[in-house]
Amino acid sequence: MAHKKGLGSTKNGRDSQAKRLGVKRYEGQVVRAGNILVRQRGTRFKPGKNVGMGRDFTLFALVDGVVEFQDRGRLGRYVHVRPLA
């Protein structure tokens, strides 16, 4: 058996913190203005009607309403908030 750990083994053993990315509010859910809808890296989802985008590409609701997702093919996937009444 080896009496040394091997050249790489002591330099391994690290991992980064999970970033908790993904969709936070799903289609049909009622949201308040300011609620985070999607956390993402880059524009996997694009902001649609009544949705804003932060510096880190986070999508958030600009008005109170109901979440809607729209797939526009090669134009991308959009997130909208349909206002209540």
UniProtKB/Swiss-Prot annotation:
Start and end residues of each stretch annotated as Disordered: 1-21
Coiled-coil regions listed: none
Keywords linked to the UniProt accession: Ribonucleoprotein, Ribosomal protein
A GO molecular-function annotation: structural constituent of ribosome
UniProt keyword annotation of Cell inner membrane present: no
Keyword Ribosomal protein assigned: yes
GO annotation (BP), single: translation
Database matches in InterPro entries: Ribosomal_bL27, Ribosomal_bL27_CS
Gene Ontology CC: cytosolic large ribosomal subunit
Family per similarity comment: Belongs to the bacterial ribosomal protein bL27 family.
HAMAP family in UniProt: Ribosomal_bL27 (MF_00539)
Name this polypeptide is given: Large ribosomal subunit protein bL27
Gene name per UniProt: rpmA
